[in-house]
Amino acid sequence: FDLVRNADILVENYRPDVMGRLGLDYKSLRKINPRLIMLSISGFGSDGPESWRPAYAPVIHAETGLIDRAARRGNLPPQDLPVSLADTNASLHGLIGVLSAVIMRDREGTGQHIEIAMIDATVFTDEQILYGLEGSEHTGPEPSQIWDTPIGPVVIATDIRRLCDLLSAE
């Protein structure tokens, strides 16, 4: 507990029950250091029917549809992604939460406990998955493309409906 007394931020990514069993849950640690900011990253959140499950990036990639989508786009058999999007997305969402908590702690003087579920961070970061789940892939943002023009290459990245409106405007 000596480390906790002087700690600024604690980051852990166990299943939600592990830190409590070790006596290291936020409620206990906050008694030692009320300014502590704790980030907990789990696969499926701290409550709910899947919260007990351990998670690894390939599991999250599969359950969010990333593996299926990549396989269909490339006409390949399903395989894990070459990068760990689930870990990266959860970490970035966690970082935003921690930075916000630091600002709040500077104003209020107390820390916070931030919880990030890898599955939530991954689903809500990949808008293409959401469009696919809603059955509206053809109305969502289109992939960007580089076009050769007389004045040089031009990148177009926009919602296709908005682009059509702009192109037909005088």
Predicted regions and their residues:
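A structured beta-alpha segment of the ubiquitous adenosine-cofactor-binding alpha/beta core
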Residues: 1-31
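Structural scaffold positions in well-ordered secondary structure
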Residues: 11, 29, 38, 57, ...
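Short glycine-/small-residue-rich Rossmann-like dinucleotide-binding loops
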Residues: 15-16, 42-43, 64
